């Protein structure tokens, strides 16, 4: 069957089978309204109906419960302690001190956990918001210029942007494009304002010129990247704009399409995949290309099997060149050959850096992104105290850290003093710890199969011990990530060592990613315990320490030494 006939078959729907039930749900939702208002008025249950459980995602929320107490509540004949997690829409992760103080106050007064969670989507999450407080939450955010539209669901999610305050002018341009792309691809329905902000119900017909009345087949993620930093992990995303500068001025973007990390255990038709390079476009074509990629995926994506609905599978099904050609046609552009660039690092530069504008920026390492007042380490209070005096802004990073940006020289010492007094600067944190990351998982995530956030700190301590045992210096560390399920929020499928939760206390153990985030790791051992994993790491690090080439990273070593095969083409190699 030729590619052209294949595409026609796909478009006619004959290849893919009956539509998934989510398509019915979206079609009947009256542009994402559903019966959410009625559910909010139902105080008999703390949860939402089956359909609205899905629909609230388009409004930036997930229904969850506290899994630590689920069994005990069941014994008492009580329903699970339903609550919602909200993820804010913050393109590029920039938030003002005034906004920060407002979200800090809400988290303290109206969430079950009293914490703020910085996430790999370069924004913050509230966890444990009970139904009576949901509308208040949205109205509080709206009062400070924040919303949560389309941070979940089958839409374009929060747009990430490289956090690079040193290159202040270029960063500002890239950040502005991240905001423009976010606004351009945002749902146009008034449902959010009507439901949460008591907006006037207008007698108008909603239209979604880009997303369509059934929205996208699956979630869609976009980034704006300033090389050589790859802090946003381009290959975890559907659409990436790599900033190309000429004499310090942004002139256009290289466009990468079709990355993504989610998969399903036991389903070899699912796999993590790197994005394909489509080529360069000038700035004035950016929004046209963004819309063309989204609408092509909207029309060609798999709406029958949600496990194969993401852009990466569409590219592999129709062919990358065919997809690219359709984007060119819809955008009225011809991709030029990509301009040279290199991605070399992913970590945040923890500590102080000075920008070319003479202002100072303090990157704070926040382990797992969890801002909470721990005994002896009141991290959440510390950031609030900084916000009370800070004259610049805060920048949340895709590594779950926080940058205090735009600090004038005369305020630098005072900001550092506050940070140190509250444990936000800890000189004992190793480079290994700073290069380790986990998703939330238990107790709040309903998809978690194993611990991640609560597991990581102590396990990293054990990895630190292994590195020390083999006499490896501080700079020789390993990109280590844990995700509680195969959906990939912790981006373990771009790590040198990636653990993917399989069952309580058990993980699939992946090796072979690289430090720059441009290679997918391969499964080394399946469904093994953390003790078995540590034993394996000890043996592997021992070999790395004695057999490696000069400056050879751990992931590169595991491939050269034949410990795992390199994943070059995911569809062919990942499960081979």
Swiss-Prot record:
Ligand binding ([4Fe-4S] cluster): 439, 445, 485, 489
GO terms under biological process: cysteine biosynthetic process; hydrogen sulfide biosynthetic process; sulfate assimilation
Binding site for siroheme: 489
Reaction equations catalysed: hydrogen sulfide + 3 NADP(+) + 3 H2O = sulfite + 3 NADPH + 4 H(+)
Enzyme class: oxidoreductase
Cofactor annotation comment: Binds 1 siroheme per subunit. Binds 1 [4Fe-4S] cluster per subunit.
Top-level taxonomic group: Bacteria
Assigned keywords, A-Z: 4Fe-4S, Amino-acid biosynthesis, Cysteine biosynthesis, Heme, Iron, Iron-sulfur, Metal-binding, NADP, Oxidoreductase
EC number(s) given by UniProt: 1.8.1.2
Gene Ontology MF terms: 4 iron, 4 sulfur cluster binding; heme binding; metal ion binding; NADP binding; sulfite reductase (ferredoxin) activity; sulfite reductase (NADPH) activity
The protein's annotated pathway: Sulfur metabolism; hydrogen sulfide biosynthesis; hydrogen sulfide from sulfite (NADPH route): step 1/1
InterPro entries (alphabetical): CysI (IPR011786), NiRdtase/SiRdtase_haem-b_fer (IPR005117), Nit/Sulf_reduc_fer-like_dom_sf (IPR036136), NO2/SO3_Rdtase_4Fe4S_dom (IPR006067), NO2/SO3_Rdtase_4Fe4S_prot (IPR045169), NO2/SO3_Rdtase_4Fe4S_sf (IPR045854), NO2/SO3_Rdtase_FeS/sirohaem_BS (IPR006066)
SUPFAM superfamilies associated with the record: Nitrite and sulphite reductase 4Fe-4S domain-like, Nitrite/Sulfite reductase N-terminal domain-like
Cofactor(s) in the UniProt record: siroheme; [4Fe-4S] cluster
GO cellular component, one term: sulfite reductase complex (NADPH)
Known function: Component of the sulfite reductase complex that catalyzes the 6-electron reduction of sulfite to sulfide. This is one of several activities required for the biosynthesis of L-cysteine from sulfate.
Assembly description: Alpha(8)-beta(8). The alpha component is a flavoprotein, the beta component is a hemoprotein.
Family affiliation: Belongs to the nitrite and sulfite reductase 4Fe-4S domain family.
HAMAP family reported in the protein's UniProt record: CysI
Protein name: Sulfite reductase [NADPH] hemoprotein beta-component
Organism listed in the record: Aliivibrio fischeri (strain ATCC 700601 / ES114) (Vibrio fischeri)
